[in-house]
Amino acid sequence: MFENNWRPQTSQEVLVARSKIITSIRNFFSRNNVLEVDLPVLSSATVSDPFITSFTVNHPLGDLYLQTSPEYLMKRLIAETKRDYYYLGKAFRADEVGRLHNPEFTILEWYRCDCDEFDLMDEITSLIHVVSKGRDCYKNVT
């Protein structure tokens, strides 16, 4: 029997919802003068966290690793420039597979230089409010 494996795994409704969420995140950080950075997903070093497993990519010049988080690269940027940054892009974790976990996922990570934990809590609240706009947009948008 012929299988329709070529069909997308995601509905148009989910694609539109994700696009709106991503756009609102980018607009939020742009309005707050936080610079988006596009970082490499391949690195010559892996994560130092013993509870996170990286994917290894075999390369003729040596093994490379898919990033599990943008943290290290972002902290290097901040140390050099003292500027606020965010990353919205792909990350990979080899051990996280299941109904609610995909080894490839979209991650949002940001750093503020002159904010304390209370400022960040307020910012998270504002971000969630802006992104959700009172809707249940968090449901099944993966």
Language-model-derived ranges and their functions:
Residues 1-119, 129:
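Class II aminoacyl-tRNA synthetase-like tRNA-binding/catalytic domains
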